[in-house]
């Protein structure tokens, strides 16, 4: 009997050690915008919008090839989950019920390609739909989608501990989710409108200051991408947002050396922003594989000196506002890579660093590699 208990105790210790090791060193698959759409009356009861025929065509062949390749990389390593950075669906459904169908169908379609959980966050297209009088608001539809799909996926994944779900500023819908996986903190963040409730965000980061990495999945990050189209469209960048809150959020992300995984602008980029207040790493990926995405990938720029040139070319905001953005952020830009691409990324996390590989289209060899350290 003593031998039995000793053996059982030994196996329990070995199992605990194996779980710790699995959560100390693991892989995450990172997907950008996927814009799911289909020719389905349940998604478009009033007829299909002709504005974005690319999405329906993309999902017929190109996206399945990309997702299949991403799943192969997931199977090659100790992969914990897939992170999708918002604009999971195209939107524009016409009714609340149709938009709910689109979110659920898009999520099921994505999940069907992977044997590990798919976790997503709210992009602008994910709440882009007409509503009729008496119907729930898009944010409420998305909140229910999270509760019925993403939260169950989190709760049944070994090693994940859900910490909280909280609302955006000026909204009651709980569309932000914080969780721990092993040593790391993850936030699924709703960047729309006024951004997450700043007090609740601060509380989550303070209570998890011991986390090895603080990784935030947000459709857009706090750093403006160097784009001429809507360069001010960023996390907490809403024009009616109080500047004090915007500045406080940026300092908070720097203080905790946050790593942002973003989408939105349909490209491949990496920014490292550092001042005496701390460092922010911001990655952008896109899965929008349109016919103009050529076979061979190369960054158009790889130097911080080029940051801001496209922001200054914008016609969307005033020249003064564009110059203020560049003056605010360019001095802190230490690394800047930017290119026109569509594909998937792998993040391999361990105690030393995070190795990021970008795979172009459906390739199985990386076209670019970054190493992120936060120490």
Predicted regions and their residues:
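Bacterial N-terminal signal peptides
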Residues: 7-18
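N-terminal active-site segment of His-dependent metallophosphoesterases
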Residues: 20-97
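Short, solvent-exposed loop/turn elements at domain surfaces
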Residues: 26, 36-42, 128, 195-198, ...
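Active-site neighborhood of phospho(di)ester-bond hydrolases with catalytic His/Asp-centered motifs
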Residues: 30-32, 82-87, 118-123, 189-190, ...
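Loop/turn elements at helix/coil->beta-strand transitions in domains of secreted/extracellular proteins
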Residues: 24-27, 77-82, 113-119, 181-186, ...
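Extended active-site neighborhood of metal-dependent phosphoesterases/phosphodiesterases
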Residues: 47-53, 93-210, 237-240, 244, ...
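Active-site-proximal segments of metal-dependent phosphoesterases and phosphodiesterases across multiple
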Residues: 23, 43, 47-60, 198, ...
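Positively charged n-region of N-terminal signal peptides that target proteins for export
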Residues: 1-6
